[in-house]
Amino acid sequence: MKDLLKFLKQQSKTEEFNGIKIGLASPDLIRSWSFGEVKKPETINYRTFKPEREGLFCARIFGPVKDYECLCGKYKRLKHRGVICEKCGVEVTQTKVRRERMGHIELASPVAHIWFLKSLPSRIGLMLDMTLRDIERVLYFESFVVIEPGMTSLERGQMLTEETYLDALEEYGDEFEAKMGAEAVLELLRAIDLAKEIEQMREELPSINSETRRKKVTKRLKLMEAFYTSGNKPEWMILKVLPVLPPDLRPLVPLDGGRFATSDLNDLYRRVINRNNRLKRLLDLAAPDIIVRNEKRMLQESVDALLDNGRRGRAITGSNKRPLKSLADMIKGKQGRFRQNLLGKRVDYSGRSVITVGPTLRLHQCGLPKKMALELFKPFIYGKLEGRGLATTIKAAKKMVEREVAEVWDVLDEVIREHPVMLNRAPTLHRLGIQAFEPVLIEGKAIQLHPLVCAAYNADFDGDQMAVHVPLTLEAQLEARALMMSTNNILSPANGEPVITPSQDVVLGLYYTSRERINGRGEGMAFMSVAEVEKAYATGAAELHARVKVRITETIIGDTGERTEQRRIVDTTVGRALLSLILPAGLSFDLVNQNMGKKQISKLLNTCYRQLGLKDTVIFADQLMYTGFRFATISGASVGIDDMVIPDEKYTLVADAEAEVLEIQEQFQSGLVTAGERYNKVIDIWASANEKVSKAMMENLSTETVINRDGVEEKQASFNSIYMMADSGARGSAAQIRQLAGMRGLMAKPDGSIIETPITANFREGLNVLQYFISTHGARKGLADTALKTANSGYLTRRLVDVAQDLVVIEDDCGTHEGLTMKPLIEGGDVVEPLRERVLGRVVALDVFYPGTEDVLAPRNTLLDEAWCDKLEEYSIDEVIVRSVISCDTDFGVCAACYGRDLARGHIINHGEAIGVVAAQSIGEPGTQLTMRTFHIGGAASRASAENNVQVKNSGSLKLHNAKHVTNSDGKLVIVSRSSELAVIDELGREKERYKVPYGTVLEKLEEAAVEAGDVIANWDPHTHPIISEVAGSIKFVDMIDGVTMTRQTDELTGLSSIVILDVGQRGTAGKEMRPMIRLLGANGADLMIPGTEVPAQYFLPGSAIVNLEDNAQINVGDALARIPQESSKTRDITGGLPRVADLFEARKPKEPAILAEISGTISFGKETKGKRRLVITPADGGDHYEEMIPKWRNLNVFEGEKVERGEVIADGPEAAHDILRLRGIHNVANYIVNEVQDVYRLQGVKINDKHIEVIIRQMLRKCLITSAGDTDFLEGEQAEVSRVKIANRELIAQGKVPATFERELLGITKASLATESFISAASFQETTRVLTEAAVGGKSDQLRGLKENVIVGRLIPAGTGYAYHKTRNEARAKKNEPVVVNKITASEAEQNLADLLNLAGSQD
């Protein structure tokens, strides 16, 4: 018995650890792990199936094959535990030690570890400062390397071929030493004195000038320091002893028929042992050098294959022509250890089945088939049966359950009561893909799902399957109920809107109920209460849509929460009055007194949640659903072919369009328009025809004419089923109806270009063969796209989760005063996103004042909720500085104040909330809805870019942003600066519209002038770029010589002649160096200056500029001196959809990025080279000037002598995020990425809160580049974690030392994930080999800070409910590094262990 207790004690030891360190194993360490040397390649005896002695499965080394029994059978049973049999040498113990005991192989010759050799950058190569090519030649016995030069002219590490080696031998004899193979490399590595090398390199670093050399030395220094600090020795990168994996981890299983199934590793090990033994024999025999060398090379190759097959040369294949799976392959990739077994596991107590609708369920319920429940809850049922005394033993209970006795069902009901189960539908794209429900037992075999949670699961009932999981422990049940219950997940974590909004039938039913019909039965009746309306409807006195007067009672909840009732008479319909029955007390009847479309219902639920809280909303949502289903049934809405009414005008419209197309075709044939213009015009004609047809069709469908009570004709909204479905938002859209009853319109080819013959037919008329063929293009592309999209979107989500996984809320307030400036988003004349939506749920960073005063409206640290937002709107505040995670100062996490409101709960975020993962899911989940394509600008899209004026939509006053302007002779303003913007401000000072206006725009109104809606306030020529004069005077041509730098062209139509400047490439040699320009002279012939400066007014003319003036002409301020034709900017493909989002998060440089000014100053052009111009910026304060070479074909936005600000655009193009960060700062780059990502999602109608994108940006910005090291341990030019640098700086400042300075760096999400501090997390993401190699060399230790690392080591994650556990552990650890108390073994575990033991002891009697 004492033994038993000892046994139980030994079972409960859990290792307490705070980190995991990885390093290089020294040969002695490997020997210390080992339980014996494996000397023979034999595995098991094929007759007896017993392992061979000293072989790969040897029982003496690795442990017994059967529990508590030695190999020869002399000692059996527990009583001999720990005895080592003297006959066969096997220890009597459990067989599971064969999973943990390792062996080793003593290698006859050292072998390089391929990871440190071949995984780039090669660590051995960096260490020895030799090229990989050279080292490989030494290792694989192709050349010698000098180890000890002695007194010769050779130098250490010099390569010698066979011939040169022999020559050297003749010349020097044995003065020197040169070897080949791994021994040579081993000696070289052993000879390195780390401390000395490091000191030497640190001394020479400052004096190195060449950039590449400096980089190389820094790299080498970092590697050396990593070795030095970690205590690894460089020679350990060469193996002398090879560890052998425990045999149960590389099993060999006899199949029937005398064959064996085996792990590939056994083959690889056998190869190594064979070659090693042969090499030993050859060395004993003192065989010729060449044979030994060959054997050593083969040994090296076989060890390479064992460690990482296929890394060097061709992979070794097995009998089935497949490469063998090496140790490296075991851990990497989707099927590797990390992703297959550590990050995701299969679990028991789960089942799966098809789902069907459960329209009668409550929101927190799901229907569970009895069969499934019986299987899933078996242990609970056994326990209950035994506890009740219905069964005497577990065995008896088992029998009862198998027979399905009547009592079993009663017990099952009891067990299931209030025991939540979790339902999951794959793919689980966000956290709402697993929710908890209370099971309701049902007959049949399908799980029933509540219709309102379908949206969260993205489930439909066309054969979808779902999995059920049973939370077993009390804590698990508690979490399932409190956190995961479907009733607690009403709001979407992505945008804070309700996610349980009704859709489809329910919407249709509610919409139908709330419609009104003119002259319906019972119109004009008046009712004293809603109950009376119900009676009238039930008796048929009034129909559902009749317009009636009703006295309703509303409950009003005051600010303090007291309830008052008030009655009033409203004009409404019978249906709406019935809807008011389910309206919860406290909501106004006006919310349902309207046509209830999907949008309205969503708003109704949202209002309900904000005003009345969770419980009322859940009950109300259920009631809405039941009512919706009921009235949808009553409505009898159905679709017949006659519902698709084709408008009569369609045929005339199509005929007109065809006539126009013919006309253009004729113009084209007579050469008046080009092919491109013709194509664009044709597509335009058809696009507008399509619009007209669909407009006519919608008017036709949406209204019908009826006779009202007075016998007069009146129009009302139609009750056509198709129209109702689309209008309510239940199913279908205007675009789909257009295809049914209008015309299908233009189709695109698979490459995205538009086919110019449209499909004029619609589906009701039917398509002919050609039309059908054209439409198959689109349909197929759609299917292909969907397949690609899913994979791409999944990969994006994976990268996002990986980069953000360790971001958790860890404190209340970091105290920072920084934040992002939020303004309403305005594009052109539309407010795309009002300020309220952008700041709702955020915390104010700096006090917001009442407009025009110093009084504080919203003090710092106010959480802006709905009421506050109303207040801001009331005072027409149009910019607020709010806290953001990007500027949060918390180390290794964020604070609650910088994050603001938890969108899914509606209050400030809790500690321990895993905001990183939520952000990644919120951005990734709608990924499948985004498009995959790149838009080719063709036809309809390209004309948007050729705007030439600004027409305002609102009245107000005009305001200019960063615009320089001059006043021309007509008294109008002409803009002479780039990136100017023009805004319309209303009387309260709120910005209503904002437009970008180019250089050369003529404004019709002065600044601050009042404008009316519809006014055209600015004009410009979209096709040319003018050069505007800023002074008045006479012009003088410089360097403009006809036929050398310019030519004269005469316009055939007008007869006017103009001067065209030649490009440098078109000029003869004489004109190459000349620089054509226009100088402005005053009346006395002296140079004029540009106003306010000492710079003479001279304007350089670039190639292909057109000048319409003659020499010595007089001009005024604001006149155009010349025009540069804008090549209709080459139709660039706009990358849209998913690829665009991925590009932004990966921070990829665009192909031809915009060129931004690196410093502020004055522009001038230096000497040109072939194909490039030299742009020089000279700062005003006389500092160093900046030069950049720019290709000639880039269209520059700047002229000589112009002033630019740092970060201004010099040449147009897509802006690169890295440039924005460098030149305009962190907040600008954050705004840029947020807005660009939001643009893509907005196009698809997906709402995501900005916060989530900011969280990802924070993670992209977590590294920095050290610019000067100060007194820290960092190296200049090193990449370091910002938090680490900040912590180090704080300590230094406290001690009065010099802190390090750094520049923030923007990393793409893949790079950022791989650069994380935790090597476990990085290794499980991508490039496993590289990450592990790097970590091992540096002897890194993983502090298990993030979620992923903790999942991998099998702990609770430091977020959510696991946050408290980690907090107490860390506190205990900090208090005094005492061991944390481990839960002692519980009674039930002891019982279980005992049972196991008895089974073990009893099984071999």
Swiss-Prot record:
Assigned keywords, A-Z: DNA-directed RNA polymerase, Magnesium, Metal-binding, Nucleotidyltransferase, Transcription, Transferase, Zinc
Gene3D superfamilies noted in UniProt: 1.10.132.30, 1.10.150.390, 1.10.1790.20, 1.10.40.90, 2.40.40.20, 2.40.50.100, RNA polymerase II, clamp domain (4.10.860.120), RNA polymerase Rpb1, domain 3 (1.10.274.100)
InterPro entries: DNA-dir_RpoC_beta_prime, DNA-dir_RpoC_beta_prime_bact, RNA_pol_asu, RNA_pol_N, RNA_pol_Rpb1_1, RNA_pol_Rpb1_3, RNA_pol_Rpb1_3_sf, RNA_pol_Rpb1_4
One Pfam family this sequence matches: RNA_pol_Rpb1_5
Cellular component GO terms, alphabetical: DNA-directed RNA polymerase complex
Recorded GO MF terms: DNA binding; DNA-directed RNA polymerase activity; magnesium ion binding; zinc ion binding
Residues that, per the record, bind Zn(2+) 1: 70, 72, 85, 88
CDD domains the record matches: RNAP_beta'_C, RNAP_beta'_N
Positions annotated to bind Zn(2+) 2: 814, 888, 895, 898
UniProt-listed Enzyme Commission number(s): 2.7.7.6
SMART domains tied to this protein: RPOLA_N
Sequence positions that bind Mg(2+): 460, 462, 464
Cofactor comment text: Binds 1 Mg(2+) ion per subunit.
NCBIfam families to which the protein is assigned, alphabetical: rpoC_TIGR (TIGR02386)
Family under the similarity heading: Belongs to the RNA polymerase beta' chain family.
Protein name, UniProt field: DNA-directed RNA polymerase subunit beta'
Source species of the chain: Shewanella baltica (strain OS185)
Gene coding for it: rpoC
